[in-house]
From Swiss-Prot:
Protein name: Glypican-6
Conditions for induction: Expression is induced by NFATC2.
Localization per Swiss-Prot or TrEMBL: Cell membrane
Gene: GPC6
Source organism: Homo sapiens (Human)
GO molecular function: coreceptor activity
Region of interest: Disordered: 348-376, 480-501
Lipidation positions, renumbered (GPI-anchor amidated serine): 529
UniProt entry keywords in alphabetical sequence: Cell membrane, Dwarfism, Glycoprotein, GPI-anchor, Heparan sulfate, Lipoprotein, Membrane, Proteoglycan, Secreted, Signal
Tissue: Widely expressed. High expression in fetal kidney and lung and lower expressions in fetal liver and brain. In adult tissues, very abundant in ovary, high levels also observed in liver, kidney, small intestine and colon. Not detected in peripheral blood leukocytes. Detected in breast cancer cells (at protein level).
A single cellular component GO annotation: nucleus
Single biological process term from Gene Ontology: cell migration
Length: 555
């Protein structure tokens, strides 16, 4: 070989060997990256025209790159913002479902109460005239307390309804006996005979069962919509950890630094990143699904035996029927009251000249349960419940499905059909690691996100607890019990405010134990039911001991 050839080739070989491994002889242009970077709204002054050495990079591969330190920082922040927006957009359906349906149900129930009160007032003004108007506060107080209960007030429905019928009996008793004067003490004695005499027939018992369980179901269902709305709103606002932000940057924008701005992440790569970043949200799913199941069960009650619309629409007719019963049995009722409370004093001559009002003989049209009027809320309860049930079913498993929903978005990943020409975190090639399972504990070996599985997110745990408490309330409402007002009464309607199925066969109930709160009477005095419970327990224990002793004596 001529000496001049060696003199040329050897220096060239030395130059080639001195280049970094894998580098091009000529640095590639960053034109595509500049265009994509500028489209994001960033200044082009940050970005070089050609690739530069990448030793300064902290997240992306330290090879020849189009990213400066400033670019990597800005793109890290951009990836965080985009992730937060993705989660919020993906959970948009469940959030709007609870927001819009809560508004519709709340409007419906409030207007239903307003319409029922107006209907009763109009009917009773036409029928009883001044007699009703002089005693209208009894009925106004009834609706005031029903509204207060619905909006979360500390109202014991059973005691409130008992008080209503007792007050109505006092007023009615005076009207059917105008020839007598009744003192406050005498009227108090009269009210004590309400249960014994049953002056209003069976209407109070049936109405108590219907009203209590319908209102318990309605109030609890709306509370459930409120809790679902609040949990969905809170959980959709994520705060990614530093480890998550690094993984997001590497997945979304390290392709920019490698000069591959149009190459999207591999689908499985995206899933592992999202499962790591949303590990705590996935743990919400179990309690969320139980909450949705309980909401669906109460929704079925609202369609059937606990339908508040079918209770409130004819309430004026039912109360009127009770008044008719009282009027028809007035002589027997008066005689028994006089026997128990004593003979009242005669009234002054002017008042005793009045006779029992003829108005009570008026009859009202029978209520047709097929008449289901709509309200200004736009629909009847049946249609509202059917709609919400469909939406609730679609919201199950929403939190564990977030990674799949996000990674299915064509604007985020290359899709499942393009597994070779996608970004795998290092280069444009197939992503090989296996996909992690859902939840925090399953991220211990996540190859993309550094997750501390020993420190569950406190905020998410608070939402889990809120759902658990609400689910328990819904289970009680399903069984006709108000979790805040359960008593130990032995009425045929069963224990607990609003329980009982009348002549129906009760469906299978949840087995659930609640913490019993003391009932509260209209004067806000606590009624200690624990003493009665202790008495029953002591009696049972004593009887058991006696039986055992007798058995021994007989041996």
């Amino acid at each position: 070989m001529p000496s001049w050839i060696g003199a040329v080739i050897l220096p060239l070989l030395g130059l080639l060997l001195s280049l970094p491994a894998g580098a091009d002889v000529k640095a590639r242009s960053c034109g595509e990256v500049r265009q994509a970077y500028g489209a994001k709204g960033f200044s082009l002054a940050d970005i070089p025209y050609q690739e530069i050495a990448g030793e300064h990079l902290r997240i992306c591969p330290q090879e020849y790159t189009c990213c400066t330190t400033e670019m990597e920082d800005k793109l890290s922040q951009q990836s965080k913002l985009e992730f937060e927006n993705l989660v919020e957009e993906t959970s948009h359906f469940v959030r709007t479902t609870f927001v819009s349906r809560h508004k519709k149900f709340d409007e419906f129930f409030r207007e239903l109460l307003e319409n029922a009160e107006k209907s009763l007032n109009d009917m009773f003004v036409r029928t009883y005239g001044m007699l009703y108007m002089q005693n209208s506060e009894v009925f106004q107080d009834l609706f005031t307390e029903l509204k207060r209960y619905y909006t979360g007030g500390n109202v014991n429905l059973e005691e409130m309804l008992n008080d209503f019928w007792a007050r109505l009996l006092e007023r009615m008793f005076q009207l059917i006996n105008p020839q007598y004067h009744f003192s406050e003490d005498y009227l108090e004695c009269v009210s004590k005979y309400t249960d014994q005499l049953k002056p209003f027939g069976d209407v109070p018992r049936k109405l108590k069962i219907q009203v209590t369980r319908a209102f318990i179901a309605a109030r609890t269902f709306v509370q459930g919509l409120t809790v679902g709305r609040e949990v969905a709103n809170r959980v959709s606002k994520v705060s990614p950890t530093p480890g998550c932000i690094r993984a997001l940057m590497k997945m979304l924008y390290c392709p920019y630094c490698r000069g591959l701005p149009t190459v999207r992440p591999c689908n499985n790569y995206c899933l592992n990143v999202m499962k790591g970043c949303l590990a705590n949200q996935a743990d919400l799913d179990t309690e969320w699904n139980l909450f949705i199941d309980a909401m669906l069960l109460v929704a079925e009650r609202l369609e059937g035996p606990f339908n508040i619309e079918s209770v409130m629409d004819p309430i004026d007719v039912k109360i009127s029927e009770a008044i008719m019963n009282m009027q028809e049995n007035s002589m027997q009722v008066s005689a028994k009251v006089f026997q128990g409370c004593g003979q009242p004093k005669p009234a002054p001559a002017l008042r005793s000249a009045r006779s029992a009002p003829e108005n009570f003989n008026t009859r009202f049209r029978p209520y047709n349960p097929e008449e289901r009027p709509t309200t200004a809320a736009g629909t009847s309860l049946d249609r509202l419940v059917t709609d919400i049930k469909e939406k609730l079913k679609l919201s199950k498993k929403v939190w564990s499905a977030l990674p799949y929903t996000i990674c299915k978005d064509e604007s985020v990943t290359a899709g499942t059909s393009n597994e070779e020409e996608c970004w795998n975190g290092h280069s444009k090639a197939r992503y090989l690691p296996e996909i992690m399972n859902d939840g925090l504990t399953n991220q211990i070996n996540n190859p993309e996100v550094d997750v501390d599985i020993t420190r569950p997110d406190t905020f998410i745990r608070q939402q889990i607890m809120a759902l658990r408490v609400m689910t328990n309330k819904l289970k009680n409402a399903y069984n006709g019990n108000d979790v805040n007002f359960q008593d130990t009464s032995d009425e045929s309607s069963g224990s607990g405010s609003g329980s009982g199925c009348m002549d129906d066969v009760c469906p299978t109930e949840f087995e659930f134990v609640t913490t019993e709160a003391p009932a509260v009477d209209p004067d806000r005095r606590e009624v200690d039911s624990s003493a009665a419970q202790r008495g029953h327990s002591l009696l049972s224990w004593s009887l058991t001991c006696i039986v055992l002793a007798l058995q021994r004596l007989c041996r």
